[in-house]
């Protein structure tokens, strides 16, 4: 039985066979997914997961693909893209609950519209709020750990539960969700009442800084490396003379050395080789090991 036949009875449509993952990542890189589904509700997600569990089909979950590198041979089994799902928002005073598919930037703007402070840092971060919790995304001294109070999660067998923030074990670009098999379907944050103009001004400042300093004009997966203790990854890479360093179609950004950009036709192999080269050269020059921040999926 083919994958399309296994999932034919599911209400999530369309089911995309041999779907190029390059179309679904901000890097514009990645081989094909055997089958991709984009559920629009918890019920559709539950149905897909239960069918996959019964048929023993491997499942890979992605959000909006903004912090992701997919290898050139693609991903086997079923890929479920959650970025279009669960875009609802519920407001209860200073507490907001977002469906996991809400973009982080949209969540930040919604909070600002309500005069609530705490999510200004998120205005320019790409991706969904569900993915942002998974990776504990952050910028400008803000991070998801500072505002999240609980998450709603679904297990790979379709069961649903609520987890308090303390159960997520937040760390730098880390949560207990990583590798757990739990799928975030909703995120609850608690913010503080603030001055709308002051919030808007702070968001405008953060947006302008990103436009000025980051290579937003080229495909990338955001910051490539985690910040090593006591250092900035981009500064170390720049000091090693690697701005503009190129492997195939992948390049250390000439605008910000903490970013690897796709200058045209880059493959995952190009990016992975560039990462290794940068790690080796920075370690040789500074004795500091750079750890990638970007999630790597798929077959080599």
Model-derived regions, located:
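Anion-binding (especially nucleotide phosphate/pyrophosphate-binding) glycine-rich loop
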Residues: 2-129
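Generic structural motif
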Residues: 15, 87-91, 148-151, 250-252
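Phosphate/pyrophosphate- and phosphate-bearing ligand-binding catalytic cores of soluble enzymes
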Residues: 16-17, 68, 154-281, 285-300
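Structural signature of FAD isoalloxazine-binding scaffolds in flavoprotein oxidoreductases
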Residues: 30-31, 37-42, 69-87, 134-165, ...
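Short, basic and Ser/Thr-rich N-terminal targeting/leader segments
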Residues: 55, 62-64, 147, 218-219, ...
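A generic local secondary-structure boundary/capping motif
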Residues: 67-68, 108-111, 119-123, 136-143, ...
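Short, well-ordered alpha-helical segments in soluble proteins
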Residues: 111, 129, 133-137, 152-155, ...
């Amino acid at each position: 039985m083919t994958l399309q036949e296994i999932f034919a009875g599911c209400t999530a449509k369309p089911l995309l066979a041999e779907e190029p993952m390059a179309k679904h990542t901000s890097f514009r890189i990645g081989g094909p997914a055997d089958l991709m589904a984009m559920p629009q509700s918890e019920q559709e997600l539950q149905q897909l997961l239960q069918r996959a569990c019964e048929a023993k089909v491997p499942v890979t979950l992605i959000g909006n693909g903004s912090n992701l590198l997919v290898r050139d041979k693609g991903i086997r089994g079923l890929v479920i893209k959650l970025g279009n799902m669960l875009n609802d928002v519920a407001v209860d005073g200073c507490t907001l609950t977002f469906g996991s598919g809400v973009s982080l930037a949209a969540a930040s703007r919604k909070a600002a519209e309500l005069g609530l402070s705490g999510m200004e840092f998120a205005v320019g971060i790409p991706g969904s709020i569900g993915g942002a919790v998974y990776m504990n995304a952050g910028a400008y001294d803000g991070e998801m750990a500072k505002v999240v109070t609980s998450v709603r999660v679904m297990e790979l067998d379709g069961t649903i539960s609520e987890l308090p923030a303390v159960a997520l074990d937040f760390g730098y670009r880390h949560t207990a969700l990583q590798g757990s098999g739990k799928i975030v379907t909703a995120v609850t944050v608690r913010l503080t009442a603030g001055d709308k103009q002051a919030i808007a001004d702070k968001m405008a400042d953060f947006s302008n800084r990103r436009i000025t300093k980051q290579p937003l004009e080229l495909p990338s997966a955001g910051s490539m490396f985690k910040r090593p203790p006591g250092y900035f990854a981009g500064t170390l890479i720049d000091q090693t003379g690697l701005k503009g360093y190129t492997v195939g179609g992948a390049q250390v950004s000439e605008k910000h050395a903490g970013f690897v950009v796709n200058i045209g036709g880059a493959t995952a192999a190009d990016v992975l080789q560039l990462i290794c080269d940068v790690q080796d050269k920075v370690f040789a020059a500074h004795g500091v090991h750079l750890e990638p921040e970007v999630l790597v999926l798929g077959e080599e």
